[in-house]
C-alpha cells in the first residue's frame, strides 16, 4: 500500500493511506423463500443473490424455477405484510429486513400466485 502525506489545518504533515483501486468486496445475500396459499413449493428454499440484483430480476428467476408463465401472477412479500418495489436492490432489502440466524444474515421472503394480503 502506498502512503501519501496530507497537511492538517495546523500545518503539520501526516501520512495517509492512498485510496485502494479495488472496490470493497460485496457479500452475497442469502434469501429464504416460503410459499403462501396455493403457490408451488420449491425444492431448494434458500437462494444466494447478488446485492445489486433487483426484485424484478429475482421475480424473473423465480418464475423460471416455479414454471409460472408470463400471463400468471407472482407476488413477493416481506414479513408477511408488504410487497417490495420491483426496482429495490437486495442490498437495501438485506440492510433493512434481514434476520440473524445462527451467525448468518438471512432475508426471508414469501411468495404467492394469488394476492395474499390486502
From Swiss-Prot:
<dbReference type="GO" id="GO:0016236">
    <property type="term" value="P:macroautophagy"/>
</dbReference>
<dbReference type="GO" id="GO:1990234">
    <property type="term" value="C:transferase complex"/>
</dbReference>
<dbReference type="GO" id="GO:0097237">
    <property type="term" value="P:cellular response to toxic substance"/>
</dbReference>
<dbReference type="GO" id="GO:0061723">
    <property type="term" value="P:glycophagy"/>
</dbReference>
<keyword id="KW-0833">Ubl conjugation pathway</keyword>
<feature type="compositionally biased region" description="Low complexity">
    <location>
        <begin position="1"/>
        <end position="23"/>
    </location>
</feature>
<comment type="subunit">
    <text>Most likely a component of a complex at least containing atg-5, lgg-3/ATG12, atg-16.1 and/or atg-16.2. Interacts with atg-5. Interacts (via the LIR motif) with lgg-2; the interaction is direct.</text>
</comment>
<dbReference type="GO" id="GO:0097352">
    <property type="term" value="P:autophagosome maturation"/>
</dbReference>
<comment type="similarity">
    <text>Belongs to the ATG12 family.</text>
</comment>
<feature type="region of interest" description="Disordered">
    <location>
        <begin position="1"/>
        <end position="30"/>
    </location>
</feature>
<dbReference type="GO" id="GO:0006914">
    <property type="term" value="P:autophagy"/>
</dbReference>
<comment type="function">
    <text>Ubiquitin-like protein involved in autophagy vesicles formation. Conjugation with atg-5 through a ubiquitin-like conjugating system involving also atg-7 as an E1-like activating enzyme and atg-10 as an E2-like conjugating enzyme, is essential for its function. Most likely a component of an atg-5-lgg-3-atg-16 complex that promotes autophagosome formation by associating with lgg-2, but not lgg-1, at the preautophagosomal membrane. Probably, as part of an atg-5-lgg-3-atg-16 complex, required for lgg-1 lipidation; the complex acts as an E3-like enzyme promoting atg-3-mediated lgg-1 lipidation.</text>
</comment>
<dbReference type="GO" id="GO:0000421">
    <property type="term" value="C:autophagosome membrane"/>
</dbReference>
<dbReference type="Pfam" id="PF04110">
    <property type="entry name" value="APG12"/>
</dbReference>
<protein>
    <recommendedName>
        <fullName>Ubiquitin-like protein atg-12</fullName>
    </recommendedName>
</protein>
<keyword id="KW-1017">Isopeptide bond</keyword>
<feature type="cross-link" description="Glycyl lysine isopeptide (Gly-Lys) (interchain with K-129 in atg-5)">
    <location>
        <position position="118"/>
    </location>
</feature>
<dbReference type="GO" id="GO:0005829">
    <property type="term" value="C:cytosol"/>
</dbReference>
<dbReference type="InterPro" id="IPR007242">
    <property type="entry name" value="Atg12"/>
</dbReference>
<dbReference type="GO" id="GO:0098792">
    <property type="term" value="P:xenophagy"/>
</dbReference>
<feature type="short sequence motif" description="LIR">
    <location>
        <begin position="90"/>
        <end position="93"/>
    </location>
</feature>
<dbReference type="GO" id="GO:0034274">
    <property type="term" value="C:Atg12-Atg5-Atg16 complex"/>
</dbReference>
<dbReference type="InterPro" id="IPR029071">
    <property type="entry name" value="Ubiquitin-like_domsf"/>
</dbReference>
<dbReference type="GO" id="GO:0034727">
    <property type="term" value="P:piecemeal microautophagy of the nucleus"/>
</dbReference>
<dbReference type="GO" id="GO:0008340">
    <property type="term" value="P:determination of adult lifespan"/>
</dbReference>
<dbReference type="GO" id="GO:0000422">
    <property type="term" value="P:autophagy of mitochondrion"/>
</dbReference>
<dbReference type="GO" id="GO:0034045">
    <property type="term" value="C:phagophore assembly site membrane"/>
</dbReference>
<dbReference type="GO" id="GO:0001778">
    <property type="term" value="P:plasma membrane repair"/>
</dbReference>
<dbReference type="GO" id="GO:0005737">
    <property type="term" value="C:cytoplasm"/>
</dbReference>
<feature type="site" description="Required for interaction with lgg-2">
    <location>
        <position position="87"/>
    </location>
</feature>
<dbReference type="GO" id="GO:0031386">
    <property type="term" value="F:protein tag activity"/>
</dbReference>
<dbReference type="GO" id="GO:0000045">
    <property type="term" value="P:autophagosome assembly"/>
</dbReference>
<keyword id="KW-0072">Autophagy</keyword>
<keyword id="KW-0472">Membrane</keyword>
